[in-house]
UniProtKB/Swiss-Prot annotation:
The gene is speC. Zn(2+) binds at H194, H228, D230. This is Exotoxin type C. One of its GO terms (molecular function) is toxin activity. Superantigen that acts as a causative agent of the symptoms associated with scarlet fever. Has been associated with streptococcal toxic shock-like disease and may play a role in the early events of rheumatic fever. Superantigens cross-link major histocompatibility complex (MHC) class II and T-cell receptor (TCR) molecules, resulting in an overstimulation of T-cells associated with a massive release of pyrogenic and inflammatory cytokines.
Length: 235
């Protein structure tokens, strides 16, 4: 009889603990997405460095040092950190284009980015992208011609930033009152492949360095192979 009573007491305590802990877990979950949005809103509220036809001063196994004096005056440079595989595609005295998001602010002589480097391109082009938007699985208006790229070879960093900027301006995806809790961009190419970009990824401490480090791979795409992009947002 005593054994049965003990079992009942243990059961009651367990139920009470579960009912007490559950709201806490739910609350923490909401806090997490709130922090993620705050991190991303701060990180991507930024003016990118957009420089054309700059000379590579020197390269290391993981860094390109790029002369930007003609844009900034004085002895100024861009330091782009990237993977070994990406850095080996460039060498001293190459001319490159830069589109990058800084992760160190107020440096006196240099600007620090991850990736964001393509061979210099002098031809003037206007690639108006075809795009679709889905919210909670339902197709919305198409986003054709909303995103424009002015180079034949671009980094995923540039595509990512310009699409995010459009979503931040028009759908307020990172605002505190935004209903969106997850989302992704899918980049489709003409060979049927798709590359995904997580719109709600804020790793580690959520600093600009943490968030932008994914661009170290300096992934690029030739716009001749670009098909379209799809955006999926979830409430």
């Amino acid at each position: 009889m005593k054994k049965i009573n003990i079992i009942k007491i243990v059961f009651i305590i367990t139920v009470i603990l579960i009912s007490t802990i559950s709201p806490i877990i739910k609350s923490d979950s909401k806090k997490d997405i709130s922090n993620v949005k705050s991190d991303l809103l701060y990180a991507y509220t930024i003016t990118p460095y957009d420089y054309k036809n700059c000379r590579v001063n020197f390269s290391t196994t993981h860094t390109l040092n790029i002369d930007t004096q003609k844009y900034r005056g004085k002895d100024y440079y861009i330091s782009s950190e990237m993977s070994y595989e990406a850095s080996q595609k460039f060498k001293r005295d190459d001319h490159v284009d830069v589109f990058g998001l800084f992760y160190i602010l107020n440096s006196h002589t240099g600007e620090y980015i991850y990736g964001g480097i393509t061979p210099a391109q002098n031809n003037k082009v206007n690639h108006k992208l075809l795009g679709n938007l889905f919210i909670s699985g339902e197709s919305q208006q198409n986003l054709n011609n909303k995103i424009i790229l002015e180079k034949d070879i671009v980094t995923f960093q540039e595509i990512d930033f310009k699409i995010r900027k459009y979503l931040m301006d028009n759908y307020k995806i990172y605002d505190a009152t935004s209903p969106y809790v997850s989302g992704r961009i899918e980049i489709g190419t003409k060979d049927g492949k798709h590359e995904q970009i997580d719109l709600f990824d804020s790793p580690n401490e959520g600093t600009r360095s943490d968030i932008f480090a994914k661009y170290k791979d300096n992934r690029i795409i030739n716009m001749k192979n670009f098909s379209h992009f799809d955006i999926y947002l979830e409430k």
